[in-house]
Every structure is written in structure tokens, then in C-alpha cells.
Amino acid sequence: MFSWLIPDIPELFLTISVWFRLQGWEDNTKLGFIIGNTLTTIFYILRLAQDTLLAGVSRKLIRDYELFDLSKSETLLSDPAFSSYHDVLFNKHHSTANASSYNKRVRKVTSTVYWSTYFLLLLSCYTCYRLFNTYKVYRIYYLKDLNLDKHPSLKKIEPDYEVDEKLLKTSLKSKLLSRFIRLLQLQDEVETELPKVTEHYTLNKWDPSKLIISLSTSFSPTIIICLMYTNVTFLTVIPIIIHQGIFYFMIWNRYEERFKDDALLMRENYLQYDTKYVKPLKQIMYQDVMTDTATISDGGFTKFFPVSKSTLFKHHEMSGDVIIERYNKKSREFENVTDIIKPHHHINNTVKILPPTIRKDHKTNRYDHRQQSILKDRKFNIDSNEPQIINALTTAIPSRSFFNNNPSGSNDDNCSGIKVRSSPTRETFFPATPLRKK
């Protein structure tokens, strides 16, 4: 039977350790408040027992009552004059023996309470130490500023990256021998992945867990030290409750909610930046149509609305690298996008635009600006003798099929033209004119 249980013992310990890791104790704030308030209550009860119950008894135990006892002398007991007092001395001896056993019990209880209070005091100081000594180390490579040396959390290190020796020593001491090979592999990977820069900094960010914060605020060393070196009575519970309430209100209802609000605002700013700047660079605007053929007898229902579709495709190689590609309609192949900041839907064509030809209409007394151009091979070709040439990265898109939504539904040719999209947020409209013959 025991031979069956022995192979299952490592699996049992592994299951228990995995279960403890999956519980998420670091983020359990409710558990920290329960444990901290319970320990504070226990410390208050121990100090109250010391000052009210054990203080008077401990004063009596300071003197030693084990003096020389004449009733134990055999010479005096053989004397007939002393025998009359023998019974009285015998009863007194039994009473002192009972008192001594009672005193021993009181001393044990007093010492237990005394060491328990000091243990709770050290435990509170340890939680406070864990609160203020929990950091995450980050390496700053690309931030260049003249005031970085004055930052209290930044530390300048050597240009060449070296693995921390303390981390290696602790890893080698705590891990098994089989982890040594994996540690060397990770060291090689980190050295190859890190960029080669001239100098960099290390940032020690204070990052305690929520469990430690809740435990330290509910079992703080301030209230423990005050209870340790003051006279505790029944009315002392009132300032304890006020202290716990102020700490809870200040740390969680205000300070912790501020971090949540900052994270929410940061997310809102990120989404706003992504909507206004990133998506217009990565996506193309199309015009979709939605029709309802069920009511075709009544004229039907047609609705045009703009949509954005991305032409970037992301996939992973076998090595784990992320590759971003786009489809080239000319070559009918996928191309790697090396610079995604560049608008992928803009074509690097040279657009040559003539200055407008001004013609005065005598009937309306207005000037008609017309642009004479020839659209050929997605370029505007003009005479080379014209003085003004504007070079832009644009795409000529028919305005009616993509951007011009005529709500009246008319097919008037006067509304036709070409929209030149020079940026994701700016569009220029040039009226279409008859092509000029060469």
C-alpha cells in the first residue's frame, strides 16, 4: 500500500503547489484586510490582558518567597516544645507549595503573552519592510534626457550588458542542476536580443502587491508600536477603530482609485490616438452599400456608409518573429512592410498639377477656375514648360465610387471629378475637364 503512495507523493506536492500559485494571492486584497485586522485584534487583546490582569500578579511575583523554612529542621522537630507548632507549620508549608505552583503557571502565561506581543511586533515590521522593499527593475535604453542623472530611481550602468551576478548566484543555489543549462541558454538569448547602445539606465520601480499593501495598512507598525508602549484600557479600542478606518479610506478609497483612474485615462488616450492617427495610416476607406430587396415594390431601401478595411496581414514565423505583410496588386504577391509608419495605401507617384486657368464669365461676373490635366498611368502628365510643379504622395480615387455620396441620387456630370487624397485627414477636390489634345 505504501509503495503505491510513494510515487504519488511528488505529484501530490506538485498539484498543491500549482493550486496555490493559481489562486492569485498577490491580488487578493480582501484576504489581506481580514488577516491584518485579525492580527491587530489579537495584539490588542494581549496588551489588554497584560495591563489589566497580569500586571498585578506579576508585581507579587517579583519577590522570592522561598526563604529558610524552620519546619524542615529535624532537630527542632525532635524538641517537644516545638512539636505543638508542628501542625501549624505543616499546614503553612502545604499552602506555600500550592501558591508556588500557581505562581509558576502565572509566570508561564506572562512569558507567553510577553513573547507573543514581540512576535506580532516583529511580524508587523516585516510586512512594512516587504511593503517598502518590493521593486521591479527596468532597463532604459532609448530615453535620452539631460536630467536622467537627477532621477532618484535611475541608476547609470556600463554600456555593455552583463547578467546580474546576484541573480545568477541565487538561481544556481535555489534551482536544480538541470536548470543550469536553461539558465545559460536564457543568458545567451538575452545578450543577443538586447540592442547595442552606448549607455543605459536601470529603473527601480516600486511595485508592491495588493496583498502586502492591504496587510500593511490593516496591521500597520504605527498602531502596534502605540499599543506596545502605552497603557491599554477598554477605551483604547476607539482610537484603534478610527486609525483602521482612516488608513482604509486613505489607501483604498482614494489612493488606489487614483491609480485606476489614471489607467482608465491612459487607455482612453491610447484609443483616441489609435482612432485618429494609427487607423487612418493602416486602413483604407471604402464605401459599402446595404440594400433591402424585400420592399422592392415600394422602391427598395439602399444605404451607403463608409467602412475602413486594413490591408496589413500579420503572421508568425517558426522562430517566433512577427511579420507584417501587404498584398501588391501589380505584382500579385505579398510584400513585407518594413516601415508601418509610412501610409501603405499611398502610392509613390509624382503628381504634377498645373496652375488654374482663370476665365471670366461675363454673365455671372465670376471667375471659373479649371484645372487642365491628363490622367494617364495613375499620373498627371503635363507640359514640362509650366513653372509650378507640386510633388506629393497621393492616390487618385474616383470620388463617386469611394468618397462622393450624392444624397439626391442625381447623375449630373457637373458633380464628377477626381479626389486627390494627400493625407488621411485632408482631401483636395479638382474638377474634371475635357482632356487636352496634344
Swiss-Prot record:
It is found in: Nucleus membrane. GO terms for biological process: maintenance of rDNA; regulation of exit from mitosis. Its main location: nucleus. Keywords: Membrane, Nucleus, Transmembrane, Transmembrane helix. The chain crosses the membrane at residues 109-129, 219-241. GO terms for cellular component: nuclear membrane. InterPro entries: Nur1/Mug154. Residues 405-414 have a biased composition (Polar residues). Member of a perinuclear network that controls recombination at multiple loci to maintain genome stability. Required for rDNA repeat stability. Belongs to the NUR1 family. This is Nuclear rim protein 1. It comes from Candida glabrata (strain ATCC 2001 / BCRC 20586 / JCM 3761 / NBRC 0622 / NRRL Y-65 / CBS 138) (Yeast). The gene is NUR1.
